[in-house]
């Protein structure tokens, strides 16, 4: 099916960022926001060649005049027209390849609805005429990237978090838990608590500034109460941040109050369990014989696990929940922001994987439902 000299394309479509590149590479070539922007105002300059939509970084840089939309919500594609624009942009503008010449590996959220993976398959073969494609579960790829086939992955991106127990390469669907609490919620929460400090951030464009503050300054406290007391009595944790207009703001306990919401979702007015309890609950839904392997191989993945201090805190919290003699190991690879993509790059370049691709011929014979038989 797949000639050795043609590299497969690996596209990891996240709620916040799209990561794309070539199988066999150790990092994605293109990383851009999963955004489609449309002008808010009527164009007045004739002959400016104004477009009716912008994708990715271009939408980001023109955000002041655009309405920004994310076609992927909570990890699942909700707007297919915009999604097609993002894929088109990925192939033709970012990677500069002809999709009809390369097999394409796409990623999907755990528990992605069946109709969604069929639609992805259909668009790849019918709109982009790919010779072959495959859909892989994101968390499974992260586990491969860490060099394991058994473990539990806590994957948290911009739109959704999941705990996915995996045994010998197979995700265990009955034990997967989804938490609609991720990067975007933390950004919104930071916007809210900065407002209490007297700084006002409201528009979609300003949210991007707050996201940057979060990425640069936030961290997870090992002990929240102790940290709050430290913050109240000294200015040691205060940091300053320069806004695009030159104004400088000071950020204090917001730095760790923001990601604390991962462990205490009640901060966001959510009823759900924190990420440590969710991970524990997910392990407890698995067969008693494999739990030991999961505790010892807890892998963090995704951009919202990049906060300094998160692995130590996770270790502390899970030790408190687990049986006393249990060996617990939290693995937080430095490249975990891209580990889904890296896992895809590894998988698509394995010689044993080459017979797993869904070919155009198989698609023409069976239709979109072929994806359920070949990708699991």
From Swiss-Prot:
Residues carrying Tele-methylhistidine: 74
Residue numbers bearing the Methionine (R)-sulfoxide modification: 45, 48
Catalytic activity: ATP + H2O = ADP + phosphate + H(+)
Regions that span the bilayer: none
Single GO molecular function: hydrolase activity
InterPro entries: Actin, Actin/actin-like_CS, Actin_CS, ATPase_NBD
SUPFAM superfamilies named in the record: Actin-like ATPase domain
Post-translational modification N6-methyllysine, affected residues: 85
Function in brief: Actins are highly conserved proteins that are involved in various types of cell motility and are ubiquitously expressed in all eukaryotic cells.
UniProt cross-references to SMART domains, sorted A to Z: ACTIN (SM00268)
Keyword NAD: no
Cellular localization per UniProt: Cytoplasm, Cytoskeleton
Protein name as annotated: Actin, nonmuscle
A Gene Ontology term for the protein's cellular component: cytoskeleton
Domain of life: Eukaryota
Gene behind this protein: CA1
Family: Belongs to the actin family.
């Amino acid at each position: 099916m797949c000639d050795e000299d043609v590299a497969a394309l690996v596209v990891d479509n996240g709620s916040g960022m799209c990561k794309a590149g070539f199988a066999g590479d150790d990092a994605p070539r293109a990383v851009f926001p999963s955004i489609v922007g449309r002008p808010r105002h009527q164009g007045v300059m004739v002959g400016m060649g104004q477009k009716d939509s912008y994708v990715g970084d271009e939408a980001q840089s023109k955000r002041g005049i655009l309405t920004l939309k994310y076609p992927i919500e909570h990890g699942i594609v909700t707007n297919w027209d915009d999604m097609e624009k993002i894929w088109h942009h990925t192939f033709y503008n970012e990677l500069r390849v002809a999709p009809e010449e390369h097999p394409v590996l796409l990623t999907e959220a755990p528990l992605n609805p069946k109709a969604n993976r069929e639609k992805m398959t259909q668009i790849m073969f019918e709109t982009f005429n790919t010779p072959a494609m495959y859909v892989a579960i994101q968390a499974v790829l992260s586990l491969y990237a860490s060099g394991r086939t058994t473990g539990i992955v806590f994957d948290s991106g911009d739109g959704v978090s999941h705990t996915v127990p995996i045994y010998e390469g197979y995700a265990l669907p009955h034990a997967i838990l989804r938490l609609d609490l991720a990067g975007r919620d933390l950004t919104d929460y930071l916007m809210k608590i900065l407002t209490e400090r007297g700084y006002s951030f409201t528009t979609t464009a300003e949210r991007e500034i707050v996201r940057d503050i979060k990425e640069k300054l936030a961290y997870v406290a090992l002990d929240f109460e102790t940290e709050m007391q430290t913050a109240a009595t000294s200015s040691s944790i205060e940091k300053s941040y320069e806004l695009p207009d030159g104004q400088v703001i000071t950020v204090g306990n917001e730095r760790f109050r923001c990601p604390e919401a991962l462990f205490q979702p009640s901060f966001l007015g959510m009823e759900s369990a924190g990420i440590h309890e969710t991970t524990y609950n997910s392990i407890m839904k698995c067969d008693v014989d494999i739990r030991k392997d999961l505790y010892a191989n807890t892998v963090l993945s995704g951009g919202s696990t990049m906060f300094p201090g998160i692995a130590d805190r996770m270790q502390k919290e899970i030790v408190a929940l687990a049986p006393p003699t249990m060996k617990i190991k939290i693995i937080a690879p430095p490249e975990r922001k891209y580990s889904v993509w890296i896992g895809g790059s590894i998988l698509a370049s394995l010689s044993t994987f080459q017979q797993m691709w869904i070919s155009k011929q198989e698609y023409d014979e069976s239709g979109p439902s072929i994806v359920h038989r070949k990708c699991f």
